[in-house]
Amino acid sequence: GLGNNAFVGVR
């Protein structure tokens, strides 16, 4: 999603 991009980077 929009802000989810950052979360994906952490994963």
UniProtKB/Swiss-Prot annotation:
Organism whose genome encodes this protein: Calliphora vomitoria
Membrane-spanning ranges: none
Main location: secreted
Keywords: Amidation, Neuropeptide, Secreted
Top-level taxon in the UniProt lineage: Eukaryota
Protein name (record): Callitachykinin-2
Function: Myoactive peptide.
GO CC annotations on file: extracellular region
Any one Gene Ontology BP term: neuropeptide signaling pathway
Modified residue annotations for Arginine amide: R11
Locations listed in the record: Secreted
